[in-house]
Amino acid sequence: MHRRNLLRAAAGIGVVAAAGCLGEDGPTALDTPDDQQADPADLAYPAYGQELPEATLPSPIHDREVNTREFVGERHTLFTFLFTRCHEVCPALTANLAQVQTDATEDGYSDEVALMPITFDPVYDTEEVLREFAEARGADPGAENWQFLRPENDERAEEVVGETFGLPFQKTDAYTPDEGDSHEMEFDHQSLTLLTNVDGYVERAYAGGAPQPDVVLDDLTAVRNHFE
């Protein structure tokens, strides 16, 4: 069942009840986003105050399977969704996570955060391609706190990214599976970066473009301080 349908099926719980569990005694460290115009339950993707969805995907650079909730109870986690031939928002989305990784290394909190970019173009985005793409954006993809997740095939990508995380994407007529960079957009897609806390709840869902790096770092710092 799609995430949106699951949320609607649980509508009896009510948005008001959900909001009532937030705040100082709730599952989040941050307050409701100032720019939040829609109720989280009306959004297809996980939003403020909601639990992180669960899916298990290969992490080819580390040669193991990783569950999206693997670090719940241990680390705050950042997710984003991309394809490496993207010439628009995807490089910035990845660079944001790389900047967090660098800041964590420099300030000594690498073991408090996990970075999980997820590709939805598994045919083209092989282990080597993912590694080179991450390194070009300033990341250390071999580090333990960087898990570049790659679905096994297109169907699994749709299941996890499109359905479990509620982020739509679609191949364009320019798509080729293995002919390199066509310098055109192979996918139409929305952008999303999720900041989830150590307890597995969404603190921020940055949608509609790449968030400013300083905003992400400031939000992460506030979350870290809250859970110290």
Language-model region placement:
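Hydrophobic alpha-helical segments
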Residues: M1-E228
